[in-house]
Amino acid sequence: EGTGKATINITGGHIGIDGTDGGVVYGSARGEADDRYVMAHHAFVKESEVNVKYPTTADVADISDTSVGCITGAVHGSGENGYGYGDTHVTLHKGLIGHSLYGAGKGIGKYKKSIPILAGDNKGTLKEREIYGLLSGKVLGNTYVTMNDGLVVRNVYGGGNMTTRSEERRVGKECRS
């Protein structure tokens, strides 16, 4: 326990600058990728809800105009390397998202670990490798993505960007026009 629900309501403003790294909205915490057997503390929330409801949907041609309300990057229901312990709810009521819409988070964090070589002349020799964090951006509950109106320039995903899963989960997706 000890964690609550994170709720984000976006109703105006310009988030990010087109053509740069940034402009991304995350529904939960930013965590640290590390070996799950070594690192006992990860950043997470119990449940997250992200609502994007601009008054109007901007035109894609205006995405670099900072006076126009939009999100230039992606929207994630969970965190960047942090994870959601329960469910995520992501709803696009109206507005422009310049990248993709994800029900879960982004698992881009890596850590280094020495792993034995399994075959060949160097069998048993340890080699250092970069490994993506097992819980990075993951949602342990269900993801719910609803798009009532608006524009997503790239894709809509029920899951996350480079996240993992340890068991089969039901992903609820709903798209209305």
Regions found by a protein language model. Give the residues of each.
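Surface-exposed loop/turn motifs in large extracellular/passenger domains
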Residues: 1-155, 161-166, 170
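A short, hydrophobic C-terminal helix/tail in secreted or cell-surface proteins
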Residues: 169-177
